[in-house]
Amino acid sequence: MPAHILQEISGAYSATTTITAPPSGGQQNGGEKFEKSSHHWGADVRPELKDDLYDPTYQDDEGPPPKLEYVWRNIILMALLHLGALYGITLVPSCKLYTCLFAYLYYVISALGITAGAHRLWSHRTYKARLPLRLFLIIANTMAFQNDVYEWARDHRAHHKFSETHADPHNSRRGFFFSHVGWLLVRKHPAVKEKGGKLDMSDLKAEKLVMFQRRYYKPGLLLMCFVLPTLVPWYCWGETFVNSLCVSTFLRYAVVLNATWLVNSAAHLYGYRPYDKNISSRENILVSMGAVGEGFHNYHHAFPYDYSASEYRWHINFTTFFIDCMALLGLAYDRKRVSRAAVLARIKRTGDGSCKSG
């Protein structure tokens, strides 16, 4: 990319809301204040969102957990998907180049629908997006088929607020497999339903595009996640139908799913904790490579309101680069960013001494 374009994007990057310290109230959040330009804020600079900050007052009820209730439909469908994806791997050498490029592009766009869309925009409100970008992200999110934005954001806010408890939908204390995919194969813990149902989701209920997606999600996901990626290679450049189905659809979808799941599993079990050694989330560079920038997870749980979800800008963080490009085009704005001073203070106060990001 030409240097002058990178300089323009970098300049757009600097036009952010600077958070000089975390908001009050929580294990992750001290009692300091914010700075936006020359103004000081005594509360979160995201007035529309409060329910993604850790709640240290919540504790699991004593006693044995309820018996797992398997959802056999999900188990069978996930097994079939991954069998199809494994077969797709064997077909990759026989695929046309256009099919491989198309599948990769579909993977990246789908991933952005989760990372830049469901996660950083709608779950945490770390930046704002104009209608064309929101429309792109809602389509990309539908391509990813990981539940609609409303449900994804509700589960993710519960994950942050009640992290590592039974009210956390993918509680990593229940093991790698459960936090990776097992939580999707069983009925939700009663605490997840109870606490998740009480979260304030009024910001998303008021967003017509999010609720439109939720209303028409099933036909939308069938078209965008399965029909379109299968038919385009087959119809447009003569790929075999089996290659299109197993590589462009099954393999691509399985890779996107597992890249996202690794944030919940591997990034809570393996890696450094330079920002907060008291929480399980970690900096995992391999996860960040697969999940287009979401692997700096210790930072993200320490500072969930930072739009970059990382201390280091574009370092193995394509999602931040994408958002900054959108800002250059005027489609993204009001990006929240934690100041260097606040980050260093947090490292000194609660870090594990590794002083490494990823």
Swiss-Prot record:
Per the annotation, the residue ranges of the short sequence motif Histidine box-2 are: 156-160
CDD domains noted in UniProt: Delta9-FADS-like
* Protein's name in the database: Stearoyl-CoA desaturase 2
What is recorded about the protein's domains? The histidine box domains are involved in binding the catalytic metal ions.
Gene name for this UniProt entry = Scd2
Per its UniProt record, what InterPro entries does this chain match? Answer: Acyl-CoA_DS, FA_desaturase_dom, FADS-1_CS
Question: What's the source species for this entry?
Answer: Mus musculus (Mouse)
Q: What EC number(s) has UniProt assigned to this enzyme?
A: 1.14.19.1
Q: Give the record's GO biological process terms.
A: monounsaturated fatty acid biosynthetic process
Q: How is expression of this protein distributed across tissues?
A: Detected in brain and skin. Highly expressed in brain, and detected at low levels in heart, stomach, lung and testis. Detected both in dermis and epidermis.
Mind listing the UniProt keywords for this protein, alphabetically?
Answer: Endoplasmic reticulum, Fatty acid biosynthesis, Fatty acid metabolism, Iron, Lipid biosynthesis, Lipid metabolism, Membrane, Metal-binding, Microsome, Oxidoreductase, Transmembrane, Transmembrane helix
> Could you tell me which residue ranges are on the Lumenal side of the membrane?
93-96, 237-240
